[in-house]
């Protein structure tokens, strides 16, 4: 790692013929090295040199842990892409445009939510996110790309598509206390909403416009939201 840092510093110096001031600062035990060049810092940790370690028990991060054995009937089989566990349900979002599956907390298969296709209540593109709203008995889907949010009841039956005035790309969704939906996605144009709040009729209630720094150029990035802090946390790889 230290050799890589030295090579990187050499490359930085070679890329620009203007004078640069650089210095190397090391931690007391030698495991961490910070290379500063013209006001920019690169920190490298050499794990082989770390002498002072601590053990962090899993209980520091996890309150409860259980093993769920899923039903093994043919209709219950899935290839999980993402798993969404709520107080009463476990939702399985599959890749390759496969149908979304809903289980109870004991692994019993309940329903397919919607179906693959281009008709009412169907989706013909890969689902990018879902939100299970147990309080109001709804399930919402956002497509990989599109101009709608799909709304179902908790039994997997389609209610309606919520129309949107703009295209959403790789959108993540969250249900607020008032029943409105918060959405974060990847905007391609400055001024388009980066994040917005919408009601179930498709009316935009609030929005945060994208700036030159928060728009994206392609679909290479991702938006992640793990919902493990009781709020709508997200990580936008294109801008974070």
Language-model features: locations:
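Sec-dependent bacterial lipoprotein signal peptides
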Residues: 1-13
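Eukaryotic scaffold repeat domains enriched in small/polar residues
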Residues: 15-240
């Amino acid at each position: 790692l230290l050799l890589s840092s030295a090579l990187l510093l050499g490359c930085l110096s070679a890329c620009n013929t203007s004078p640069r001031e650089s210095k190397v600062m090391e931690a007391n035990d030698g495991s961490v090295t910070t290379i500063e060049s013209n006001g920019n810092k690169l920190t490298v940790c050499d794990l082989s040199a770390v002498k002072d370690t601590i053990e962090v028990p899993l209980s520091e991060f996890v309150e409860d842990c259980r093993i769920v054995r899923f039903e093994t009937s043919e209709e219950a089989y899935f290839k999980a892409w993402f798993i969404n566990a709520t107080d009463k349900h476990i939702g399985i979002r599959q890749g390759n445009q496969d149908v979304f599956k809903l289980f109870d907390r004991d692994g019993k298969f309940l329903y397919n939510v919607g179906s693959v296709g281009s008709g009412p209540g169907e989706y013909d593109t890969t689902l990018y996110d879902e939100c299970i709203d147990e309080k109001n008995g709804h399930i919402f889907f956002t497509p990989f790309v599109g101009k709608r949010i799909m709304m179902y009841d908790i039994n997997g039956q389609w209610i309606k598509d919520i129309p949107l005035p703009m295209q959403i790309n790789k959108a993540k969704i969250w249900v607020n206390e008032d029943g409105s939906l918060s959405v974060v996605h990847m905007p391609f144009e400055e001024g388009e909403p980066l994040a917005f709040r919408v009601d179930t009729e498709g009316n935009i209630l609030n929005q945060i416009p994208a700036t030159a720094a928060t728009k994206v150029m392609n679909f290479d990035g991702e938006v992640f939201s793990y919902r493990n802090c009781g709020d709508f946390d997200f990580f936008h790889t294109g801008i974070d």
